[in-house]
């Protein structure tokens, strides 16, 4: 679970803050 979360986190931040 944690591995998947760490994988998805950057994409979520990118989508929310528009900062990649």
Curated annotation (Swiss-Prot):
Disulfide bonds join 14-20. Keywords: Amphibian defense peptide, Antibiotic, Antimicrobial, Disulfide bond, Fungicide, Secreted. Expressed by the skin glands. GO terms for cellular component: extracellular region. InterPro entries: Antimicrobial_frog_1. One of its GO terms (biological process) is defense response to bacterium. It is found in: Secreted. Antibacterial activity against Gram-positive bacterium S.aureus and Gram-negative bacterium E.coli. Has activity against C.albicans. Belongs to the frog skin active peptide (FSAP) family. Brevinin subfamily. This is Ranalexin-1Cb.
């Amino acid at each position: 679970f944690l591995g998947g979360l760490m994988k998805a986190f950057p994409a979520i931040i990118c989508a929310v803050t528009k900062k990649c």
